[in-house]
């Protein structure tokens, strides 16, 4: 495994572990998701460079567009929950209370 592969693999695993174990605030969960998406973007971009084909270079840009949509939807949910519940803590968010 090359150092480049190790770095984006460890970045993805760190984001996944942060999402699984550090579940206090919604903003920290969104940041972990963004870190995972960024490492996937880097991995997909490196894969497209290795294949040296024009058709494979569209997939990283599509992933980046979906990542931006995910970030905007996540921030909209963060603002909505902060306004209704008064906090962004994940423990206070319960679907049965709505």
UniProtKB/Swiss-Prot annotation:
Regarding protein family, the annotation reads:
Belongs to the complex I subunit 4L family.
Under the heading Gene3D superfamilies, the entry gives: 1.10.287.3510
Q: Any idea what job this protein has?
A: Core subunit of the mitochondrial membrane respiratory chain NADH dehydrogenase (Complex I) which catalyzes electron transfer from NADH through the respiratory chain, using ubiquinone as an electron acceptor. Part of the enzyme membrane arm which is embedded in the lipid bilayer and involved in proton translocation.
Chemical reaction(s) catalysed:
a ubiquinone + NADH + 5 H(+)(in) = a ubiquinol + NAD(+) + 4 H(+)(out)
Q: Which residues cross the membrane?
A: 1-21, 29-49, 58-78
- The protein's name is NADH-ubiquinone oxidoreductase chain 4L
- Does the UniProt entry include the keyword Electron transport? yes
Q: Name one Pfam family in it.
A: Oxidored_q2
Annotated compartments: Mitochondrion membrane
**Cystine connections:** none
């Amino acid at each position: 495994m090359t150092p480049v592969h190790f770095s984006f693999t460890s970045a993805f695993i760190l984001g996944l572990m942060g999402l699984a174990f550090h579940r206090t605030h919604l903003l920290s969960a969104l940041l972990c998701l963004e870190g995972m998406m960024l490492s996937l973007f880097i991995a997909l971009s490196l894969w497209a460079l290795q294949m040296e084909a024009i058709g494979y270079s569209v997939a990283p840009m599509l992933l980046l567009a979906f990542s931006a949509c995910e970030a905007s939807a996540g921030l909209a949910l963060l603002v909505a929950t902060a306004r209704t519940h008064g906090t962004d803590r994940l423990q206070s968010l319960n679907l049965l209370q709505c």
